[in-house]
């Protein structure tokens, strides 16, 4: 609610849908300044829109991040997050326990772009994970709660290993939502969502979100020239210098949304704003219902196995630590 407290007496109660492609400025000089500054994106709705901005601010606050940006889908959020710091000849590491569509993106599409995905078992030892790193490895990727296996990802352990190697940890927090887990608190540097699922909550709207923690030092390792070196599209601006704490999402907005058009529409942003208002209530009920179904299926003689953190064979306390007491939605 803090995001909304700047409203004055007589202001509209709900955020308006700003269905506009462009925005008004008083002079050509002002327009030129905005176009030349990658941190000022309210020039064309392919980059930014006031309704979308409201969603971004709320989700950044919920995740405890420094900045956020929306995309046209969860898959677009994943794609943009990888392409933002990886290029042909690079590699990255991903957990084997992730969404099937993401595996297809990583194993087939990224391979065709010259980017290698190296998979590691989420239960691998630290030494086994370390062995997967190469000189050209740019990031580590995992899902808080895997889709659909519901495996719980040890965010803190993978974050420590990633940081030891000078690269960020990107975590897909779609299934957990910030109500059940805030990956940034456990060391994640970038958090992404398919807002289509629990943020929207009603099966009507496709969208994605990318949240930046603001804590990762993009300059330290020298591995991320996309963020640290002068960008020719913006007269030699370095994103790390121009947007400290938000360089990652600023570059995606300025470069990848410009080039791919993977932009969330204002109407969809408005629907996500409505979904966020009931997120905690809905997730709480999902959890309650899921545990009842788990209990029923566990006792059913014709059910061989139920995938859910509360009945995991793994004695590890990870799911208790990162989630709220095994609370998660159920997928069969």
PLM feature spans:
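Glycine-rich, charged/polar anion/phosphate-binding loops
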Residues: 1, 5-7, 193-194, 256-258, ...
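Single conserved hydrophobic/aromatic residue that forms the stacking wall/gate
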Residues: 2-13, 322-332
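A residue-level signal for beta-strand positions that form part of recognition/binding surfaces
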Residues: 16, 41, 269, 329
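Positively charged, low-complexity intrinsically disordered leader regions
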Residues: 19-24, 28
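Conserved N-terminal alpha-helix of the aminotransferase class I/II PLP-enzyme fold
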Residues: 27-79, 101-110
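Glycine-centered tight turns that cap/initiate beta-strands
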Residues: 64, 302-305
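Conserved PLP-enzyme active-site core in the AAT-like
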Residues: 68-298, 307
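Conserved PLP-binding catalytic core of the aspartate aminotransferase-like
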Residues: 305-324, 329-330
């Amino acid at each position: 609610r803090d995001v909304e407290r700047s409203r004055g007496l007589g202001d509209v109660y709900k955020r308006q849908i700003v269905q506009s492609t462009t925005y008004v400025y008083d002079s050509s000089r002002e327009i030129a300044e905005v176009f030349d500054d990658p941190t000022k994106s309210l020039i064309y709705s392919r980059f930014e829109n006031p309704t979308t901005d409201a969603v971004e601010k709320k989700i950044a606050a919920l995740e405890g991040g420094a900045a956020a940006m929306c995309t046209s889908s969860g898959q677009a959020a994943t794609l943009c997050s990888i392409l933002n710091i990886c290029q042909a000849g690079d590699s990255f590491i991903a957990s084997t326990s992730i969404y099937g569509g993401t595996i297809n993106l990583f194993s087939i599409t990224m391979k065709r772009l010259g980017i290698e995905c190296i998979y590691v078992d989420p239960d691998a030892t630290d030494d086994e994970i370390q062995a997967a790193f190469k000189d050209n490895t740019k990031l580590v990727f995992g899902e808080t709660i895997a889709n659909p296996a519901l495996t719980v990802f040890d965010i803190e352990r993978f974050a420590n290993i990633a940081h030891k190697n000078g690269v960020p940890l990107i975590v897909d927090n779609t299934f957990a939502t910030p109500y059940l887990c805030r990956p940034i608190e456990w060391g994640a540097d970038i958090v992404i969502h398919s807002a289509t699922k629990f943020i929207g909550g009603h099966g009507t709207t496709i969208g994605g979100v990318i949240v930046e923690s603001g804590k990762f030092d993009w300059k330290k390792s020298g591995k991320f020239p996309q963020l640290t070196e002068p960008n020719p599209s913006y007269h030699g601006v370095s994103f790390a210098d121009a947007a400290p704490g938000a360089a990652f999402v600023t570059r995606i907005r300025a470069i990848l949304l410009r080039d791919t058009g993977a932009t969330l529409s204002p109407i969809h942003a408005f629907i996500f704003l409505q979904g966020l208002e009931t997120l905690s209530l809905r997730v709480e009920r999902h959890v309650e219902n899921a545990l009842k179904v788990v209990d029923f299926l566990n006792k059913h003689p014709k059910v061989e196995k139920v995938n859910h953190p509360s009945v995991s064979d793994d004695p590890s306390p990870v799911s208790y630590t990162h989630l709220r007491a095994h609370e998660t939605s159920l997928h069969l």
